[in-house]
Amino acid sequence: MSFRCSVCGYVYEGEQLPDNYECPICHQFGKFEEYSAKKEEPLDSKEVSGPLDLSYDSQIARQDESCRYMKEIHEMAVSGKSIHSSMGTQMKMPGWDDILLLGAQLNPLPLDDGEEVNTTTVIGKHAKKPLIIENPVFISHMSFGALSKEAKVSLAKGSALAKSAMCSGEGGILPEEKAAADKYIFEYVPNRYSVNPENLRTSDAIEIKIGQGTKPGMGGHLPGDKVTGEIAAIRGKKVGQDIQSPSKFPDIQTKEDLKELVEELRIASEGRPIGIKIAAGRIEKDLEVCVFAEPDFITIDGRGGATGSSPFFLRESTTVPTIYALYRARKYLDACGSDISLIITGGLRVSSDFAKAIAMGADAVAIASAALIASACQQYRICGTGMCPVGIATQNPSLRARLKGDAATQRVANFLNVSLEELKMFARITGHKNLHDLSNEDLVTISREISEYTNIPHA
């Protein structure tokens, strides 16, 4: 008999479905139903010489949560392959909930409810054509390929309705997405997808991707089953061909090389802000190179951010947590007298997180998972399989059809607009008429660890 998962379509073959069976693809319980499909008649058993069955005896196999990585070791032992996982780590980390905002009472005084708060955010204040947005929270880089066309366009439309910005991701420019966005940040990657004079002139900012938090030092990978004709055309690849991005720019070997690229892009874009994105690792050493290159903005991607697919143990064992990364980056830039715009990303979810990050010194916040959740994401955490049941992280036409673009657009806009209003609320209750006047003086922490390794005092 066959049983098919109603969520992701995985088919289980067996005489009987085990009780409380967990789907190995989407990890859902109780979602299987009987399934019939035409099959070829099996060959005589004597003539069949199949591969060695490495699965553990189901009668005695078990999982012990107290045994560290038992499940993962079993999986690698049977498959002979590294484990890849989607979204961000679920390991415990220093969290934004351990930081608290101090409401003003008498000294200082709070603002009245409804009093106007300035939220205008300028990225690249010294650029010839700075990027100006009314919402300091924008949608981070996620590629067309990892995400469906419908997801990308609805995110762009939602960001436009919220007077925010949309990022291209490393897969090049999807024209419909760029047209839908109010402000558009183009990601410049080693493969140079969509790099031409027109795209450089018409993007509102350009960001050089050096790394990302979930897989620092590693290039991106898009499996062939996600490479449709449209994606292949944008990336200059063959349909169905696996696409691997280099882990570094071959022509950036020194800080002088990076500075030269920044200047080339600044000229080619006719003065748009040029940024550099790095994973939070050797923060001060990397920032030394970045500052020398004189970009208009720097993005720090901290531990806690997400990805469509990353080697599991790479994701679990790398990158400085976002709170510490932001503190160290702000401290370094202040120490060297730099006013380069600082953008933080990596695991920030809601308005209180955004307000705390701005108080710690971020000029803007880039979000990915939160925007996807607002759109339609239900956190099945199977993005890398291409079987996303809500139509976001897939190129399967029938699954893509499940994402209702207009509704997704409005949900994203609602989330960003509500977040902006709540940011204004946090500014008022701390006594600030300008959101960007939030500072370390408006924060305390209930974490001894955070108080010891940042400049946030303990409550």
Regions found by a protein language model. Give the residues of each.
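Residues immediately within or flanking Cys/His clusters that coordinate Zn2+
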Residues: S2, N20, T385
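Short, cysteine/histidine-rich loop/knuckle motifs that typically chelate Zn2+
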Residues: S6-V7, P24-I25, M387
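Short, non-ligating residues that shape and space the ligands of small metal-coordination modules
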Residues: V11-E15, F32-E33
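Short linker/helix segments within small regulatory modules
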Residues: G14-E22
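Active-site-facing alpha/beta catalytic cores
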Residues: A127, E134, H141, A146-E264, ...
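Glycine-rich phosphate/ribose-binding loops and adjacent secondary-structure elements
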Residues: F249-R400
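Gly/Ser/Thr/Ala-enriched C-terminal appendages of enzymes
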Residues: R349-H458
